[in-house]
Amino acid sequence: RDSXVTIVPLRNMRDIVYVGXITIGTP
């Protein structure tokens, strides 16, 4: 159960970083 709880935040963090990289990459 703990592993599932840790995987969700990591996934959300990855999406945020991915979107953030695109926003910063675009002028």
Swiss-Prot record:
Tissues showing expression: Placenta.
GO biological process: proteolysis
Enzyme class: hydrolase
E.C. number(s) listed in UniProt: 3.4.23.-
Keyword list, A-Z: Aspartyl protease, Glycoprotein, Hydrolase, Protease
GO molecular function, one term: aspartic-type endopeptidase activity
Post-translational modification (record): Glycosylated.
Family: Belongs to the peptidase A1 family.
Protein's name according to its UniProt entry: Pregnancy-associated glycoprotein 62
Organism expressing this protein natively: Capra hircus
